[in-house]
Amino acid sequence: MRRPERAELVHIPNHFCLLVAAGVCCLANPAGLPSSWFMSVALAQPAALTASQSEALNAYNRTVQDFRSILKERRAQIDAKQKLPEKPGQALYLARVAMMGAYKDLTDVMPSRIGRPNKYKIPPAYFDADNEPLIDEYKNLFRIMQAPPANAQASDTPYKDVVDLGTVIARIKGLDAAHAEVAGRISLAVFFAETDGNQNIGNARSESYKGSFQTGVSEDKIGQKKWAAIKKSVAALDPKLNARDDKEEARVGNSDSRYNHWTGVRNGLMNAHADLFPRIPAIMKALPDPTDQMRFFELIQIIPSPAKAALNSGNLLNYRISEPRIMGYLRNNSMFAYGKADRAKTSATMREILDSMWLFNDIFDRALAKFGEVKAQQKG
């Protein structure tokens, strides 16, 4: 999801501003109800909004309106086949971040506004489930804006390819079968985190990162060179996979290898992750939760040097990052991006960073489910 990235206004009724019992205190008492009944009704009415609550509520409603407006504008442009602005997804991304940040500011001053769970598994303090249709449209628009180019070379087995490549690379790097399987799972999780599980996509928020692993040109070339260095070992270990690799290389020819699913994934893994595969046993010991393992390897995509420094520190979870540039990269990828309290953070430990990656929760759950399907098919 490394993207510099990747309906009607939902009105929050201001129950606190309703007239108390429609002015019931001014009515006669035709039913002969006891005066204590009127007293209990009056006491049951919530107190008026404070200035900070009113400000937060108004700010949130404005951001919902702004988000709805940019979604509507981009949909109209797409439907009319108009030329889209450069990086057409950036305005949508910023509007979504603003809406979720404003909601977090609202729930910080009005905890009672925290509502029900939502299908995207976003913490309810950051997102009103009534706005799910807006996120549905957001995802649909990104799917259109990031559609693979006409010359992209798709795979009939995109998920299996990722697992197979991650697994064989891990074996070449010296892992046993069990730990190599973990590498395959992690590889699939990174693919989902980068592309939402869609192969050969473009990037509506960047002119640099493309394909199934969202790599830049230089990253892709580095990965290609590293793969060439282990090619003979791959051929000896897994002749069938090596034959597939030869076929895909021939298929790519002189075109952009990032837009061939196989080579895009292969080069992306070799560039950023393969050198860390031998350390998977140690990473699993430091991070026993499989979701944390997947989060950490996604951080290798986003902030590779600091993530590796944290691993090398010997105290992974307590390693603190405070460089403003790195904190900016994290915020650009939906960590510490929502609300005044989150954005005020000037540093964070690796534990805090991993915990802040809750926007990836649904993505990793789907990746795990798909990994289970791939393994079941292999055993079947």
Where are these regions (language model features)?
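N-terminal pre-domain segments of enzymes
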Residues: 45-138
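N-terminal secretory signal peptides that target proteins for export/translocation
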Residues: 1-15
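Acidic/histidine-rich, surface-exposed loop or edge segments in extracytoplasmic proteins
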Residues: 71, 137-151
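Catalytic glycan-binding domains that act on GlcNAc-containing polysaccharides
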Residues: 145, 149-339
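Boundary at the C-terminal end of the N-terminal hydrophobic targeting segment
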Residues: 42-46, 152
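Bacterial N-terminal signal peptides
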Residues: 13-37
